[in-house]
Amino acid sequence: MSKPAARNPTMSVSGYQTSVVRCAVAVVVILAGIAWITVYSHVAMDAANFSASPGLIRPHTPFPWMSDLHKWNYAIGFGLVFLGLIIASHPTTPLGRGRGVVIGMLGSFLIGLAYIVTYYFVGQSTSFHIPVMDQLNQLNLLVGVGFMAVGFTFATKWE
């Protein structure tokens, strides 16, 4: 009886092993974070920001549990985006090896820097409002620093 053949890993054109499942999970988690923030901003935020006054009726929302979380929804949404980027920094994904690490690292750093600079220039203006930035106020700094922290996870994979 002969030995069973060894399982050949999936190789991409570059010669590296690529995990399609890990890539798909990273994309799904990032999209889930974006969807979470979008749903909260467009559907549940009115009920979350409602202050009771005589004669006013609380706005209806299909997600009352989401309205109860208030600004924690932003932490969940951005946390999912950061987690998806961290998953994408694994060496079995294209962003986790070779030039992809540099792209992911510099991209995350520059997105974080641009987010903070945009907040400082536009976020405190009374005439111009960016939908998520005008709700987070000083917490925008944590979002920018979060993107930079994700850049460090890419930097740890750099060879």
Residue ranges and their predicted role:
Residues 92-99:
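Membrane-interface helix-boundary motifs at transmembrane edges
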Residues 77-84, 143-154:
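Hydrophobic cores of alpha-helical transmembrane segments in multi-pass inner/ER membrane proteins
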Residues 128-140:
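Non-cytosolic membrane-interface motifs at loop->transmembrane helix junctions
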Residues 70-79, 137-143:
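Structural signature of hydrophobic alpha-helical transmembrane segments
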Residues 86-92, 154-157:
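Structural signal for the C-terminal ends of transmembrane alpha-helices
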Residues 37-54, 117-125:
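Membrane-helix interface motif
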Residues 1-28, 43-65:
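Terminal, Lys/Arg-rich, intrinsically disordered segments and adjacent short helical elements
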Residues 100-115:
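Transmembrane alpha-helical segments of multi-pass membrane proteins
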